[in-house]
Amino acid sequence: MKMRRKMSEPHGEAGNEMPNKKQKLSSDENSNPDLSGDDNDDAVSVESGTHPERPDTPTNTASAPGRKSWGKGKWKSKKCKYSFKCVNSLKEDHGQPLFGVQFNWHSKEGDPLVFATVGSNRVTLYECHSQGEIRLLQSYVDADADENFYTCAWTFDCSSSHPLLAVAGSRGIIRIINHITMQCVKHYVGHGNAINELKFHPRDPNLLLSVSKDHALRLWNIQTDTLVAIFGGVEGHRDEVLSADFDLLGEKIMSCGMDHSLKLWRLDSERLQRAIRGSYEYNPSKTNRPFVSQKIHFPDFSTRDIHRNYVDCVRWLGDLILSKSCENAIVCWKPGRMEDDIDRIKPNESNVTILGRFDYSQCDIWYMRFSMDFWQKMLALGNQVGKLYVWDLEVEDPHKAKCTTLTLPRCTSAIRQTSFSRDSSILIAVCDDASIWRWDRLR
């Protein structure tokens, strides 16, 4: 089924006027975007092996005080056990950068593999089928032509089990789409500027985290339409927040941004647990008082010793952190010393322990985000010239991580984000030239 549906205007304003585009750093002026799949290329290059030496950057010169690292220098990537083949590609007809892509990991076994892309004022849903087919399901267009969606995240309705997709971008408005009823069912206005990333809580499908250009993070309850907490202020981020992630238990948030910092925020405090419980109990029809959102001004840990530039992507890997900047490396690290329990880290802790680096090349522009598969066994990142790097994370020591480089002569535009299907059989990459690339894992 194909469709295009306009999303209605919200009943409130998002605050100050916001830029309508992210920094566009790579494009193909001669492209003729369409939605027809390209012919499969049997001559796909799947290169594995050692990467060339990476030039020195401020992050691999002298170590910051309190830093500790396993081993010396860099490690060489050996042949990775994972192999992929590009089986299909297509271009969306708006021709603008696609900033985000996410598979729906909440689907049941046997259901079609559905993923969403966001870019320009468009949200598009696709199904992956056998023989490399990518089938267009639905396309939603925002009523404001100046909207530019940057991020999306999947959850589900607890009462109906319908999959829900949250999207947001330059206007700072969060929209919730039910693709079964084909409607934008909710929207949230609160941030004073663009929203750069959305994440749902790993154990509570109603808790949505948003991070913004207004220097703050917000935690929402989409079941009761309440703003649970605002993270920022006195000791919060000093510039645009670019990324954040929940740990697997949903007890901690790590955020990062343009101020080069990474900050840890705990959700398991009595104050926040009480606020979350209160958000479920709040009923506006029974009271005239608005819900009182918690304002969290002080993070539980903060550091600027990992990166020397914008930190544009962060993910938890167990109790470890993976983060990247515009420095051609993803850094694996942990707060405190190696032997420290992360749950006992104090806000004044100044030590960080660097365990390893995943090096790559030609990726020194910002807002390029990596992803992991559901079981956190693979790590994927694209660079600004269309190359994909896939690391095998099933190693005891990050220094022994193995990498595969995926290249295609036709893919030369910046890869903004990647996403694995839940079973890790498919890897999707989206690019600045509105192209979508499907890589199937070879068994």
From Swiss-Prot:
Taxonomic superkingdom: Eukaryota
Subcellular localization: Nucleus
A GO cellular component entry from the record: ESC/E(Z) complex
InterPro entries: PcG_WD-repeat (IPR051243), WD40/YVTN_repeat-like_dom_sf (IPR015943), WD40_repeat_CS (IPR019775), WD40_repeat_dom_sf (IPR036322), WD40_rpt (IPR001680)
Biological process, per Gene Ontology: digestive tract development; exocrine pancreas development; heterochromatin formation; liver development; negative regulation of transcription by RNA polymerase II; regulation of glial cell differentiation; regulation of neuron differentiation
Database matches in SMART domains: WD40
WD repeat extents: 93-136, 148-187, 190-230, 236-277, 306-343, 361-401, 410-443
Record region (Disordered): 1-74
Keywords for the protein's UniProt record, in alphabetical order: Chromatin regulator, Nucleus, Repeat, Repressor, Transcription, Transcription regulation, WD repeat
Feature: compositional bias, Basic and acidic residues: 1-14
Summary of subunit composition and partner proteins: Component of the prc2/eed-ezh2 complex.
Role, per record: Polycomb group (PcG) protein. Component of the prc2/eed-ezh2 complex, which methylates 'Lys-9' and 'Lys-27' of histone H3, leading to transcriptional repression of the affected target gene.
Protein name: Polycomb protein eed
